[in-house]
A protein has these predicted regions:
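Post-HExxH zinc-binding segment in Zn-dependent metallohydrolases
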Residues: 172-248
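Pan-zinc metallopeptidase signature
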Residues: 232-291
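Conserved aromatic-histidine-acidic binding/catalytic patches
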Residues: 73-80, 152-156, 217-229, 253-261
């Protein structure tokens, strides 16, 4: 799976997103705000595509705002996929779809961190210079598949289910509940991950112990800013059913591809994710928020 990309409280220096499964041009570009132009609003009943002049995102010609969170897209990103990402974010944050977020503390931290998602069509699209203090995540146009869930969770996976969840977890849960979802050693999440990996590995081991069920081996994925968030994604989406038909595709990283396997094998993460304090989503987003 693609390594989670995040902006970690960026200083004034230019920062570019990186991706473990693809080679993205690291050369920075300088951007300036653009004057909004006419943008087709789309046909979603809940979200409107708008032009913007937000600092640092000049190469992204439009955006959708979900509960105050910006989702930017370059011109080559299809409207249907931009709106799909917006609906997925809304469904993760308001999983019972009653019009109010399920965990206000998580959203508050996302807003405090000025969280954002950027949607790109080519690798060069994410050579950006966001303002200091923003946390972000990227999602590709071609890896977004609005029909994955509708088609019985078969066919090409919908990366929106992963990347949108990453920014919610990274900018929201990790800050709202550092003892539970913090990404450093000693949090409940990290402790559960250490069990799942068969030990506490600050760097990727040459091989994981027999019996480990989380075996991510990307050497660019560090313990505190990647491994924990990937682990959280695997566990939560497996509990929601996203991985039930994908074992052959994911077994090199994750073995517990069903809710039953997570519950019976990874009791620590199951207990954390079902703790009512955190009101984690239980229904897999399908991109049809309140429809």
């Amino acid at each position: 799976m693609k390594k989670m990309n995040s902006f970690l409280l960026i200083a004034i220096s230019i920062v570019a997103l990186n991706c473990a499964s693809c080679s993205k041009d690291d050369s920075p570009v300088t951007t300036t705000p653009t004057t909004p132009t006419s943008i087709a609003p789309g046909n979603d009943p809940n979200f409107t595509i708008v032009a913007h002049s937000d600092e640092g995102f000049a190469t992204f010609n439009r955006k959708v705002v979900v509960f105050g969170i910006d989702i930017y897209a370059v011109a080559a990103v299809e409207d249907i996929k931009l709106l799909h990402a917006a609906n997925v974010m809304a469904q993760y944050l308001d999983n019972n779809e009653d019009g109010a977020v399920d965990n206000q503390a998580v959203l508050d931290k996302m807003l405090e961190n000025r969280a954002f998602l950027v949607m790109w069509a080519t690798e060069n699209d994410i050579n950006i210079d966001p303002p200091a203090g923003r946390l972000g995540q990227d999602l590709g146009n071609d890896e977004t598949n609005p029909l994955f869930v509708a088609n019985g969770k078969t066919g090409e996976f919908d990366a929106a289910l992963e990347e949108v969840l990453h920014i919610i977890n990274n900018a929201g849960h990790s800050f709202a509940y550092p003892e539970a979802f913090g990404q450093n050693i000693g949090s409940d999440l990290a402790n559960a991950m250490d069990i799942a990996r068969g030990g506490q590995f600050l760097t990727i081991p040459s091989s994981y112990p027999a019996g480990a069920w989380y075996t991510y081996d990307d050497t660019t994925c560090e313990y505190a800013d990647c491994q924990t968030i990937e682990y959280l994604y695997w566990a939560l989406t497996s509990m929601m059913g996203a991985q039930e038909n994908r074992l052959d595709d994911i077994s090199q990283e994750w073995d517990l591809n069903t809710a039953a396997l997570v519950q019976s094998t990874d009791t620590a993460i199951h207990a954390l994710l079902t703790n009512p304090t955190y009101n984690m989503p239980t229904v897999l987003p399908d991109g049809t928020y309140r429809q």
